[in-house]
Amino acid sequence: MQYTEVMVRYGELSTKGKNRKDFIGRLAGNVTRALQDFPEIEIHPKHDRMHIVLNGAPFETIDQRLKLVFGIQTYSPTIKVDKNLDAIKKASLELMQATFKDGMTFKVNTRRSDHDFEYDTNQLNMMIGDYLFDNMDNLKVQMKKPDLVLRIEVRQDAIYISNQLLHGAGGMPVGTAGKAVMMLSGGIDSPVASYLAMKRGVEIDMVHFFSPPYTTEKALAKAKELTGILANYSGKINFIAVPFTEIQEQIKEKLPEGYLMTIQRRFMLQLADRIRAMRGGLAIFNGESVGQVASQTLESMVAINDVTSTPVLRPVATMDKTEIIKLAEQIGTFDLSIEPFEDCCTIFAPPRPKTKPKLDEARKLEDRLDAEGMIQRAIDGMEITPIYPNQKFLDDKAQEDADLL
C-alpha cells in the first residue's frame, strides 16, 4: 500500500498550555533527526497534529523510526485525496483491501472541520460503507470496538483517509524537560532508568566509572554499546568515562570493609554532581531500586545522598526486578546488560557491606582521604565520546569471550 503521509497525534503536549508551541517544535526537530536519511520527506507540525509527507518514502521503515520518538501518542499511515466522492471511495476501497482479513469487523468514522463540504458525516459514513459492501466480501459492521476503523477526515485543504491507529512511545519529547546526567553501570537497571528519564523529556549525558586494570576495555565498550542502543530514543548521547581506580584503591586500603560500598557511592555521586554542573544539568539520575542491594537501602541512600543537594532521581526505585527485566527486554538492552564483563560496582565488593550505614561515620571515614584531590584528578582524566544510535564498540571476539564465561 502506497501511503501519501503519516498523521501524528501528540501525547502529553496537550497539557502544556502556553509552552505548547515550543514542545511541538522540539518534537518536530526530534522527528526530523530520526528521519534525516529520507531527504524526500516533508514534516509539517501543526497545533493539533503533525503531518509527515512521505513523497514516496517507504512507510514500513518510517514506522520503525517513529516508534522510538518520545512525545508521539498515536500515528496513522494516511492517504490524502481530493475533495470529491469518487476519490474518497477509491482510496477507501484500496485501503480496506490492503488491510482487511476475513472475520474482521469494521466501521466508518467521518469527521469534518470543513463544514462547507457537500456531504455531512452521516452521509459519508453511509455512502462509503455501502460502497465497501458492494465491492468486498465478508464485511461485517460493528459499531463498538471493531477490528478496523476507516477514518475519514474532511479538512479545508483535502480529505485524509486511514484505518490504522498505531501507538507511539508516548511521554514527552527528549529535551523539553531540561538536561541531567545519568549514572550508567553495565547492569540491567541503569539503562532502563535512562530510558524512563528520556521518556519524561530529559536529555541525558551518561556518566560511567571505570577502574583499569581491574575493569577491562570490554566492560567500557559494553557500557558504550548500551548507550548506543539507548541513543535510538534521542539521536545522540554523550558518554563520559570517568577514571575511578585511584579512589577505589584508596578506599580499600584505608577504610573498614563494611563502609567500602557506601564511601565509593559517595564519591561517585560527588563526581556525577561536578560533571552535572560542568555540563549544565539540573539533576542526577541513577538505576537504584529500593532495597535491591546493600547500597540501595533507605539508610544507605541517606548516607550517600548527603554529599549533594542536587535532586537525585531514581526512575526504577519502586519496580520489582522482574518488571525492570521486562522493560529491559522491551527496549533491547537486556541481552547486552547480562554479558559478564565486570564493572567498578562489582570489583572490591565486600562480602558483608553495611546495609544501615551511619551518616556521621561515613563523613568521618571520608575525611581520612584526600577527597578533593582525588575527585579533581578523576575529573581531569574523564573522556567524552558522542555516541549515535546502534553504534558498535564490542567486537565479535569480545562477544565470543563473554559467551564462554
Swiss-Prot record:
Domain THUMP: 60-165
Record-listed E.C. numbers: 2.8.1.4
Entry GO MF terms: ATP binding; CCA tRNA nucleotidyltransferase activity; tRNA binding; tRNA-uracil-4 sulfurtransferase activity
Top-rank EC class of the record's enzyme: transferase
One GO term (biological process): tRNA 4-thiouridine biosynthesis
GO cellular component labels: cytosol
Pathway membership, UniProt: Cofactor biosynthesis; thiamine diphosphate biosynthesis
Keyword Cytoplasm applies: yes
UniProt catalytic activity: [ThiI sulfur-carrier protein]-S-sulfanyl-L-cysteine + a uridine in tRNA + 2 reduced [2Fe-2S]-[ferredoxin] + ATP + H(+) = [ThiI sulfur-carrier protein]-L-cysteine + a 4-thiouridine in tRNA + 2 oxidized [2Fe-2S]-[ferredoxin] + AMP + diphosphate; [ThiS sulfur-carrier protein]-C-terminal Gly-Gly-AMP + S-sulfanyl-L-cysteinyl-[cysteine desulfurase] + AH2 = [ThiS sulfur-carrier protein]-C-terminal-Gly-aminoethanethioate + L-cysteinyl-[cysteine desulfurase] + A + AMP + 2 H(+)
Chain's role: Catalyzes the ATP-dependent transfer of a sulfur to tRNA to produce 4-thiouridine in position 8 of tRNAs, which functions as a near-UV photosensor. Also catalyzes the transfer of sulfur to the sulfur carrier protein ThiS, forming ThiS-thiocarboxylate. This is a step in the synthesis of thiazole, in the thiamine biosynthesis pathway. The sulfur is donated as persulfide by IscS.
Name of the featured protein: Probable tRNA sulfurtransferase
